[in-house]
Amino acid sequence: MTEAQPDKKTAILDTALVLFTTRGFQGTPTSLISREAGVATGTLFFYFATKEDLIDELYRVIKSEAGAAINDGIENKNSIKEKICRVGKNGISWGIKNPEKMQFMEQFAHSPFVSTTAHEEGMSHFLFLQELIREGIKEGVIRNYDPDLLCMMLAASLSGLIARVTAEPDPKKRGLLVGQGMEFLWNGIAA
C-alpha cells in the first residue's frame, strides 16, 4: 500500500481552515473538505479518523505556529518589559499576516468541538509566557496577580489590538496604534 503524500495533509488542513472559519464546524461536511482540497474522502480519513480529529490537529498546528512566532527573538531582550513588548509585537505581526488562523483560534478557543487534550497541547506552546510573567512578578515589575489571569488578559487585549490594527488602512496610524496598544498592555500588567 502506498502512503499518502504529506502535501495532501497540508491541503486538507488549509482547506479545513477556510471552511471552518466561513461555514462553522457543523456546516462543513468532510465530503466538502475533501472536494475543496482536491483529495478523495478516503485520503482525508487516512490522515484523520474523524472530523473531530481534523479540527484537533488544525487547532494544535495553529497554536504551535502562533506560539513559535510570538516567542521569536525574546531571548535577545534584556528586561521583562522588552520581552513582553516583543511578544506583543510578534503576536500583532503574526495575527495581521494570518487573519484566518486568528479567526479560527478565536472561534474555536472555547469550543466543545476541540478536545480537552488538543486545548492542553495547544496551550503548552505558550507556557513560556506564563514563565515570563512569573519572572516579572518575582522581580517586582509585574503585578502580583494570578499568572493565568494575566496571560488571558494579555491574549484578549492582543486580539482586540490585532483587530483594530488590521482594520486601519493608514500605515502610519497602524504604527501609532501598535505603540499605543503596547503601552496599554504593559501598563495593564506593570507593578
Where are the language model's segments positioned?
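Amphipathic alpha-helical packing segments from all-alpha helical-bundle domains
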Residues: 64-67, 71, 97, 114-139, ...
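Amphipathic alpha-helical segments used for helix-helix packing
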Residues: 95-113, 163-167
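Short, hydrophobic secondary-structure boundary micro-motifs
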Residues: 102-106, 117, 145, 174
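Hydrophobic alpha-helical connector segments
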Residues: 57, 71-97, 151-154
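C-terminal peripheral helix-coil segments that are non-catalytic and often amphipathic
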Residues: 2, 86-89, 93, 127-139, ...
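Basic, helix-initiating cap at the start of DNA-binding domains
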Residues: 1-23, 28-36, 53
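Short hydrophobic/aromatic patch on the recognition helix
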Residues: 37-48
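Alpha-helical DNA-contacting segments of helix-turn-helix folds
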Residues: 55-62
